[in-house]
Design a protein with these regions (language model features):
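Conserved N-proximal alpha/beta basic substrate-recognition cap immediately N-terminal to
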Residues: 1-33, 48-51
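Amphipathic alpha-helical regulatory segments at dimerization interfaces
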Residues: 30-33, 148-152
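Phosphate-binding site of ATP-dependent enzymes
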Residues: 68-132, 136-147, 164-172
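Short catalytic-loop micro-motif centered on adjacent basic/acidic residues
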Residues: 16-19, 42, 95-97, 160
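Glycine-rich phosphate-binding loop of ATP-grasp-fold ATP-dependent ligases
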Residues: 15-18, 40-78, 106, 125-135
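ATP-grasp fold ATP-binding core
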Residues: 8, 34-59, 88-102, 119-122
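Conserved metal-phosphate-binding beta-hairpin within the catalytic cores
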Residues: 109, 153-181
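Short secondary-structure junction motifs
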Residues: 15, 38, 91, 156-160
Length: 181
């Protein structure tokens, strides 16, 4: 995930604002910095899959809530520090990023040698559960974004991007997966 975010940045392709934290001693400092700019942030291990060890720190939450559909935990800052921070000890480096808003989209892309053959945007019924259903949408902005990703990464074959929008209504790439979701 870290190398993908760095390449997205290099290619000027939108991705969430993020910080890499590679040791526990810096985590509180970086969380405080991100929370000053964003009211809600996401903390996730750079190498996890399927929402494992993903925390959403939100000022809108009192206590914590474990999602029924995923392993995601939404928590206030105090509960994160007192109850959950230690669970990430072996998960460094961590990605701290702005929390994006729902809905989530999958961008299915079929490409050959950096040329798009087919790009299909799908809007998820449930942002946290990609296989819980979707509707195909005709979103020209997402299709253009897919073309740029295919070209810049010189992709060949079938790929899936996870996309959500920021608070300024701009699409942000969360992941590029070499397979359909």
């Amino acid at each position: 995930k870290i190398s993908t975010y760095k390449k997205l940045e290099k290619f000027n392709i939108p991705r969430p604002e993020y910080i890499i934290v590679d040791k526990s001693a810096l985590l509180n400092l970086e969380i405080n910095k991100m929370l000053k700019k964003h009211k809600e942030i996401v903390i996730k291990p750079s190498n996890s899959r399927g929402s494992r060890n993903v925390f959403i720190i939100s000022g809108k939450t009192k206590g914590f809530k474990i999602s029924d559909d995923t392993r995601e935990i939404t928590t206030d800052l105090e509960h994160f520090r007192n109850q959950f921070k230690k669970s990430l000890t072996k998960s460094y480096p961590l990605i701290l990023m702005e929390k994006l808003r729902e809905p989530a989209y999958d961008l299915d892309m079929l490409a050959w040698k950096g040329r798009p053959l087919r790009i299909i945007p799908r809007k998820r019924f449930n942002a946290s559960v990609p296989n819980n259903g979707f509707v195909i949408v005709n979103n020209k902005d997402l299709i253009e974004l897919g073309k740029k990703i295919i070209s810049k990464f010189n992709l060949s074959w079938l790929y899936d991007c996870d996309i959500m929008y920021d608070l300024n209504n701009k699409p942000q790439i969360l992941e590029i997966n070499p397979r359909p979701s």
